[in-house]
């Protein structure tokens, strides 16, 4: 069950759900329910000791709890709520009903303890506290309540915000109780390292590389007399710092009044510092000319090395309100007073002009985009161009504003986007860049007219001139017979225009010149208009033939280059990509450019500790080799690994692409159903990426090799072998036994363990028993329908993880899923080691080889790849699994007719080994409208339920068993046709016409 509150735990965030059931009853004897969400900042105390007494706070938010229509029984549903990862939540229900009540919590297929009690108002209270929210604890929580009057169900849906990476939050200060010291706190995931940065100088001169800077990696600071004091928190995402706001009475006041912004509920800290030759002076704080109340300030003093007295007076408020806004003035009997303006806001803001801006620059002009803004809290920002993101730097200005500049445009015309956000606000500003260029002119002529074409920016204008055959000068302007077509403009590029001259007898036999001009200059072309024959002749035949010769030579060289490149085909790129959505539509996204990220050397593994074996796969760009890695998982232990590498003559772009893939994998994290990164070798030699080794190869060949060993149930196997396998299925100490459905949900794992399972065995015993069980199962060398379901479930679970990490796979197929011990399957991306030139599954389309039969329509026809296009590919993968490795669309070649079939909504027939329910899932994955396809969390839930049902049916005649499938599916909620109508709706089963 979810981790309950523990004594003494410090929680960064507490979210409380309350559902209050009042005594008023409708005509149908249904209770009136009000669901409430209450957010808590809980930094000083832990959640209550018992889940029966959760915290309650102010500022409730109505979740609009309503009776669910068309549901069996009385079901109330609260609005879906998203919480941060590692948040702590309490689900609470108050029942205003006479008599005793009984209750039951149900979460992901499992019943959880429920202990109601009564409060002072004689209301029944049911609560559950979950600490440090993880992905496995997100889902639907059902509370079944039975009173003397009626029965009803309350449904809470809790999900984790789908952020690209973890969080790093700006630290803040708190006074240590009974001591003159400050505590620095940062609520971040993963847990940050907190450090104090002390500097003897102020502002820009206080650089961290300066010898005057002192760093202290501790959370409590007693040395509070320094000139510049900052607290910084750092984790995998980087570093965030907060400066202790200081008024120094010995410094000359700033030209503009210093300003400090805070949000309601945040702590306020202002330090007033003064130095004098003796101790005969004091400091006071005033807010709007009124002395601060006692308890909102404290003073410290010390003597410096030159025997001068240093006094500091802190003004602080533990949780500010709107009435704390105003001018805070620090006064001294020996120094001029100084003030600061403190502004308290309800929520964060970003103030800047968001109107789009257009710029025109010359080809070699130095230019930077810039955005000037005022924001609180500090923003996170990116610059984006052509779906690529670039680092964003900020610089503070004296007037409280900040500025961000982007100069790395490389004079590429187009649309540039500045995006900024903080915890409460978002801001986007668009820029358009045009490059001014002199027009370039091309000319052609026929028997009746001459035409000239030009591109340039700004829009060029045209003139035609007639040249005398006795003089090279062309001075006589032609105005009759000239027709200028309407100009077109390339997207964020040059203007393309043309002008045509209709021939007349007056100009035949003469040279004419067409000229295009704009503010950058003029370009001209000369044409000879001949009267005999339909074709014009260029005046200089030598130049004409020389041009033809150069063109032919260019064509020959280009052909040779194309032939050379054809062998190598296209530049290497990882199919797995992390995306950043930029708009409300899934189609508005760009791939995260990991070239700008730093590689974390903690992943570096000594290449001398690798002993290479055989080649597992080889392709146009690289190969994957089996190897033995010594000490990569545990000192003194060797394991088998798969090493991904480029071929010897890889160019710099391919090495850069492989390094980008490495950086992405380090950010991705690990999952049981993903081929996980174990380490890398990047120093002093070729780049090696070290992955988990899967001993049984890819799922496609695994299924094909097991066709003769397939049985629908274990009962068939026992009958066929006269129950000779029965001793194999005697229960091991760690086996899952029928009828034992009690589970525990661990906050740091997807795994489920029985309450009476392996808790009395050592780790070595458990590892030995598990290995022994796996070897016995694999010796059977059989494949069952439950195995197929388990494969489908595990792949969906892996894709659910990738969806949570904002990743798209783009080549999901059975050939890209690997099988290892225990029939565990793992999604991989070893396209580098696949020879797509000779693989018939990859078909030439445009200038690329693509896995056409696995691709969604939007990917095939529009080049759009989203998690929904991966769902389509997953449907094809399901078809592969339940046909035991048959190639999709059997007997249908990939030609123009195939593309028409896809556009017309054609679907494959039900595969031989699939049930009707599985086939319906396939059809829903193949919805032409991507919005009607199910999500991977829905697919995981449904397949987990199917797997549980199949398990019950298959083993009903067996006293003891060991499941072939890892039991991770048991932590999924049951699939409900009422709860997931979108998954099996007729709209998802039948394509739009």
UniProtKB/Swiss-Prot annotation:
The modification Phosphoserine is found at residues 574, 759, 993. It comes from the Eukaryota. Its main location: membrane. The chain crosses the membrane at residues 544-563. It is linked to Leukemia, acute myelogenous: A subtype of acute leukemia, a cancer of the white blood cells. AML is a malignant disease of bone marrow characterized by maturational arrest of hematopoietic precursors at an early stage of development. Clonal expansion of myeloid blasts occurs in bone marrow, blood, and other tissue. Myelogenous leukemias develop from changes in cells that normally produce neutrophils, basophils, eosinophils and monocytes. Can be used as diagnostic tool to establish the exact cause of acute myeloid leukemia, and to determine the optimal therapy. This is Receptor-type tyrosine-protein kinase FLT3. It comes from Homo sapiens. The lineage of its organism: Eukaryota, Metazoa, Chordata, Craniata, Vertebrata. The gene is FLT3.
């Amino acid at each position: 069950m979810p981790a309950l509150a523990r004594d003494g735990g410090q929680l960064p965030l507490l979210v409380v759900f309350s559902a209050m059931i009042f005594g008023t009853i409708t005509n149908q004897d249904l209770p009136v329910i009000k669901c409430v969400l209450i957010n808590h900042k809980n930094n000083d105390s832990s959640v209550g000791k018992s889940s029966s007494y959760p915290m309650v706070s102010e500022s409730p938010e109505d979740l609009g709890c309503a009776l669910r229509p068309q549901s069996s029984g009385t079901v109330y549903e609260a609005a879906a709520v998203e919480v941060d990862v590692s948040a702590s939540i309490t689900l609470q229900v108050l029942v205003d009903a006479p008599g005793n009540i009984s209750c039951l919590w149900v979460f992901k297929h499992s019943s959880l303890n429920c202990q109601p009690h009564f409060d002072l108002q004689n209301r029944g209270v049911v609560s559950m506290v979950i600490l440090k929210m993880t992905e496995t604890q997100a889902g639907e929580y059902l509370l079944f309540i039975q009173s003397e009057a009626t029965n009803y169900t309350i449904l809470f849906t809790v999900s984790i915000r789908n952020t690209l990476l973890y969080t790093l939050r700006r630290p803040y200060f708190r006074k240590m109780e009974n001591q003159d010291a400050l505590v620095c706190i940062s609520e971040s995931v993963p847990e940050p390292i907190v450090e104090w940065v002390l500097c003897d100088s102020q502002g820009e001169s206080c650089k961290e590389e300066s010898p005057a800077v002192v760093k202290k990696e501790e959370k409590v600071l007693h040395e509070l007399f320094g000139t510049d004091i900052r607290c910084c928190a750092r984790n995998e995402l980087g570093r965030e710092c907060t400066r202790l706001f200081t008024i120094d009475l010995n410094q000359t006041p700033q030209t503009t009044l210093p300003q400090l912004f805070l949000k309601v509920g945040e702590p306020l800290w202002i330090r007033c510092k003064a130095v004098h030759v003796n101790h005969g002076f004091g400091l006071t704080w005033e807010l709007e000319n009124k002395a601060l109340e006692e308890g909102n300030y404290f003073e410290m003093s010390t003597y410096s090395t030159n025997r001068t007295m240093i006094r500091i007076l802190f003004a602080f408020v533990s949780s500010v309100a709107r009435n704390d806004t105003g001018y805070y003035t620090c006064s001294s009997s020996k120094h001029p007073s100084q003030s600061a303006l403190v502004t308290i806001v309800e929520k964060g803001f970003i103030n800047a002009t968001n109107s789009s801006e257009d710029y025109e620059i010359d080809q070699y002009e130095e230019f930077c985009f810039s955005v000037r803004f005022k924001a609180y809290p500090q923003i996170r920002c990116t610059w984006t161009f052509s779906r690529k993101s670039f680092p964003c730097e900020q610089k503070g200005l004296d007037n409280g504003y900040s500025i961000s500049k982007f100069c790395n445009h490389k004079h590429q015309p187009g649309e540039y986007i500045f995006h900024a956000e903080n915890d409460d606000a978002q801001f986007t500003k668009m820029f358009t860049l045009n490059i001014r260029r002199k027009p370039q002119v091309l000319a052609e002529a026929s028997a009746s007219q001459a035409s000239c074409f030009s591109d340039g920016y700004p829009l060029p204008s045209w003139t035609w001139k007639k040249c005398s055959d006795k003089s090279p000068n062309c001075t006589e302007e032609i105005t009759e017979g000239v027709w200028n077509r309407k100009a077109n403009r390339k997207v964020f590029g040059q203007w393309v225009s043309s002008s045509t001259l209709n021939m007349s007898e007056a100009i035949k036999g003469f040279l004419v010149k067409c000229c295009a001009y704009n503010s950058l200059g003029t370009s001209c072309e000369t044409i000879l208009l001949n009267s005999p024959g339909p074709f014009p002749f260029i005046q200089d035949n030598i130049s004409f033939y020389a041009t033809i010769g150069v063109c032919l030579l260019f064509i020959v060289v280009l052909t040779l280059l194309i032939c050379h490149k054809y062998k190598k085909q296209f530049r290497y790129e990882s199919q797995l990509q992390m995306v950043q959505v930029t708009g409300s539509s899934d189609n508005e996204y760009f791939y995260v450019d990991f070239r700008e990220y730093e590689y974390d050397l903690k992943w570096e593994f000594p290449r001398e500790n690798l002993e290479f074996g055989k080649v597992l796969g080889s392709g146009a760009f690289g190969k994957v080799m089996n190897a033995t890695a010594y000490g990569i998982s545990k000192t003194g232990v060797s394991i088998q690994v798969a090493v991904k590498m480029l071929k010897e003559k890889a160019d710099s772009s391919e090495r850069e692409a492989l390094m980008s893939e490495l950086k992405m994998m380090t950010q991705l994290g690990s999952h049981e159903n993903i081929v996980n990164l174990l380490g890398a070798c990047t120093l002093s030699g070729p780049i090696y990426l070290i992955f988990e080794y899967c001993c049984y190869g890819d799922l496609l060949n695994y299924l094909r090799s097991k066709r003769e060993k397939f049985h629908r149930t274990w009962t068939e196997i026992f009958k066929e072998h006269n129950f000779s396998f029965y001793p194999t299925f005697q229960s091991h100490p760690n086996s899952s036994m029928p009828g034992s459905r009690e589970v525990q949900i661990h906050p740091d794992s997807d795994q489920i363990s029985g309450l009476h399972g392996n808790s009395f065995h050592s780790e070595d015993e458990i590892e030995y028993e598990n290995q022994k069980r796996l070897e016995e199962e694999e010796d059977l060398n059989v494949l069952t329908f439950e195995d197929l379901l388990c494969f489908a479930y595990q792949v969906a679970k892996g894709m659910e993880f990738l969806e949570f990490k904002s990743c798209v796979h783009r080549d999901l197929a059975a050939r890209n899923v690997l099988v290892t011990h225990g029939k565990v399957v793992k999604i991989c991306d070893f396209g580098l080691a696949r020879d797509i030139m000779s693989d018939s599954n990859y078909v030439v389309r445009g200038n690329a080889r693509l896995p056409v039969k696995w691709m969604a329509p939007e990917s095939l026809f529009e080049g759009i790849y989203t998690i929904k296009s991966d769902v389509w590919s997953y449907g094809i993968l399901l078809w592969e699994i339940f046909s035991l490795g048959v190639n999709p669309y059997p007997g249908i070649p990939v030609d123009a007719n195939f593309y028409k079939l896809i556009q017309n909504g054609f679907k494959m027939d039900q595969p031989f080994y699939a049930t009707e329910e599985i086939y319906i899932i396939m059809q829903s994955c193949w919805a032409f409208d991507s919005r009607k396809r199910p999500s991977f969390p829905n697919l995981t839930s449904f397949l987990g339920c199917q797997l549980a049902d199949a398990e019950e049916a298959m083993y009903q005649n067996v006293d003891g068993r060991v499941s072939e499938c890892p039991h991770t599916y048991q932590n999924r909620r049951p699939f409900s046709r009422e709860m997931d109508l979108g998954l099996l709706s007729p709209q998802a089963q039948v394509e739009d016409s």
